């Protein structure tokens, strides 16, 4: 498989695919009770190979076009519905999208480090999500990265306090 190739699909919504994070060979598919998929093991090869999805002009896409691109790239399955945390379906139009860039849990990623060098890509992603529904970005009062504090096309909300201050 290549990075971005579909590893499996949502059985209730087959157009929602889940993409491989690495290129290599699928070595195991582990299932639990009632054949619940627990894990797909991909042995990474030496050099990453990427599936091509082509490029597009974001300004020419509407919300449905963004959904189509997310489906094609295998990324749509990572959008969850609240309050139950289940994958959403492409036919559902959300009232709002919440992006959490707030570090309040121990051992969680530092968004200042994670975004370094990827600010333009991050903004493109936020702009794409905002075409689907009103988008909110939650950040920490301590964050100084301009990609977070001055994000465009979203409503930025600043949180402060210990876990679970910014639960989404």
Predicted regions and their residues:
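Short, Lys/Arg- and Gly-enriched loop/turn segments at beta-strand edges
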Residues: 10-21, 35-39, 50
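Generic structural motif
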Residues: 1-4, 13-28
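Buried, small/hydrophobic-residue-enriched core segments of structured protein domains
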Residues: 30-168
